[in-house]
Amino acid sequence: MASAVYRSISVLTDKRLWLAILVVCNILITCTSLRAQLVRIDIDSVTWQNRRYVVVPYKKPLRKKVGLILSGGGARALCHIGVLKAFEEKGIPIDAVVGTSMGAIVGGLYASGYSASQLWSLAQNLKWDELTALSESEERRNLFLEQKRLRDKAVLTLQFSGLKLIIPKSLSAAQKLTEILDLLVLSSIYQPQGADFNTLAIPFRAVTTDLVSGKRVVLASGSLSEAMRASSAVPLLFAPIEQHDMQLADGGLLANIPVDVGDSLGAEYKIAVKAVSPLYENPQDIDVPWKAADQVIGIMMQEPNERQLRLANCTIAPNLNGFSATNFERIDELLQEGYRAALEVADEIKKEIQLAQTNDLNIQGYYKTVVGIETCAPFREKIEQIIAQATGAKAALAECLETDFFTDAFAEADTLNKTIVFHLKPTPKFYAVKVCGVSPDEAEAINDMLYGEIGQFYTNQHGTARLEAIVAFLRQRGYCLARLRQVRVFSDTLHIEIEEGTLKSIEIQQSRGWAQRFVIERELSVRAGAPLKANQIKSSIYSLYSMGIFNRVSMWLEHLEDSSAYRASTLRVKLDERFFELLRVGLRVDDIYAGQIFLDFRNENFLGTASEIGGWMMVGQRNFTAQTEFRAHRLWNSYITFFVRAFLEQRNLYQFQTRFTEPGVVPERNIIGEYGQRFWGVSVALGWQLYRDGNAVIEFTRWRNELIPLSIAPTLEAVWLSTLRARFTIDTRNSPIGATQGAYTNIYYDFSPSFLGSQISYSKLFFSHEENTSWFGGNLIGRLRLSAGFADNTTPFVQQFSLGGIGSQFSTIFYGLRFDEFRGRQLIVAGLEAQAPLPIQLVVPTFFSVHYNVGNIWLFASDVKLRDFLHGIGIELSLRTPIGLARLATAMSFRLGEFERTTFVQTVPPVYYFSLGYEF
């Protein structure tokens, strides 16, 4: 019986087991059926990284990766900016940029975040003639006072190493272009991270040529500004860039349209913009060596250019007939030509870069609903229309994302019941903005910038633009290191964390290692561990370059992020050191001393301290000067200046007899004789530099003053003097003669007491001031001069003031009098000048000016009377030649006299002046 019971239980258990198996199978079949009915659909989206600032990450429908290749072409290549503007307006994306020469400059700036509109404005406002000028020197206003005086005399500078003449590699180091590119990159919204050009807003490549190996070099890292500068370094004209063992120059030598480089960036659709210059057709156009070299290169590059263009999916060739690669006067037309050419093909490009969604689900006949746009009134109707008309699920999702109002989109389809739900995620709304990491004033300004977006819907692109505007705002305030460290929307609030940044370190790279490090560091306005401002960089570049011991000064930032996403920034300072043994040559011809030559030879970086040791001499038919000196413009890290010199100076002067008209008296001006002045001695001075505008100096001079009889002489003088001079000088003029801006002030007091060894004890005070201003864009220049001198009655003849002439460091300017025509101990003179360019220019810049002077000079203070004031009027034609200013002038002096109670004008014969070259 027990076994029967066991068999009954076993049968019952088997039935239950089979029943359980059937239930499980039914559940599995049901789930499989449901799974077949519900399908999640995601679009094919782009896989490359979006490097721009975003409010939140967002998807973009899959398309071809677009690479833009910008050719060289000099000024012609500015048409690239017009192409970029058209692409922005048409919504054509750029995923990679490759550039050569000017194309590298345009492409590099665009990749770093400058918009086409900003580049358009830059192209119009930059002084291209100055940036590409072959003659290059330190700006006068950035030189120390004594440097200004020395360089004002020279027309030619030769470099030596020992006694070996150094032949420069090029006509220009292109410092101005280097500087503006450095500053533009430092002010850009996106800067390379880890010196990698892939981390810019758009990955970028600059194509250059290594002059050593003769190979093409594609720059993908390093200094962005230096890469642009290297790619545009035209051989012979601009110095190549030294990197490691390479000499990098214009990429157009080997690849003026480097389409194949786009492949290395993964570009699937390559757009080439051709702006290369055609061959010269007129033999007369090949008039200088570099044009001949350019023609040879152009001939050699014709076939490679065509081969590269065949690799492009689209070629844009603006109509640039009649435009020169070196003429920057028709920039607006160049921009418009590029814009027009790009607009013509923009729609076709937009179609060709599109890719169809793969394995799309046909949703014709499906019941469609949309989730996520319930509160999106501004664009809900448009989205509903897109969905209603859709035949493919992925295509509909892609079209919704193309509106740019959504960050994500997917669909769920029930293939059994023919229903589909589209899930759209709009850009997040925010109703408040919280900014941290900046000052309260800056935070308030940023809040104001985002006021229009509060509570509103916006596109992803608009969100990026507003965030970039915040960084641009910080750049305008000078913050070179500022960035948006984190952006997120949380609890209906837009949180923006800003890192203004501090400089971690400064790395100095010298080409030859001649200058001592403290000399370089004292000129830097930046400090490690402190915030970095753009004006500090600009000031540092100016100061270093103005020292005169560097051919080129370049600065850039390198950023590295730590594990916590905080950034460490290093400022790299690259210095191309100049050979410091220099010979300067100057020439001058005038109506007083005829031909004169100036020679100066000195070491301008003595012992690596930027101090100067050397000598100069000036030789003319009637004058001679020689001087040896040691000069430290700055002692150690201070602005204390020091110099010591030994000198010899001799000048021959005419003695005049001048008679003004009187009743029965004919006016005349006669030379009645000639005498000479000789000075020799030693001098030592200590003072303080007033930055680079001037200095205040105490100077002690022990010297011999001699009056040398020639055909006539005043009372013979030959005395030893020990003179203390306190001098204050400010010089902000942009030129020593014919300045258009700036001022010059010189005040000194001489004291020559007997207890210091002077054979004659005297004192004198002198003041002069010149003010220059311009109106109507520099087409009218005004100049005011004031001079006054007061000396005691014991002042010897050789130390008295002089009056007359149109320009000299020895005689106060007075149009209508000859140079050094009158001498005395009391001087008061004022002068006005108006200058304007001639409508017809005589080969070089030509100006016409009118002059008026009033004042006089007297022997004794008791003689000073207002009625004795002389007046002078004159006209002048001046030409700015390569060897200095050429001046032709005529003037007449007069005074008001009285005869038999009648006031009349007394005149003297007119004076004619001529000079060519700089003043010595």
Residue locations for each model-derived region?
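Outer-membrane beta-barrel transmembrane domain signature
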Residues: 852-873, 896
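Gram-negative/organellar outer-membrane beta-barrel architecture
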Residues: 438-448, 460-461, 469, 483, ...
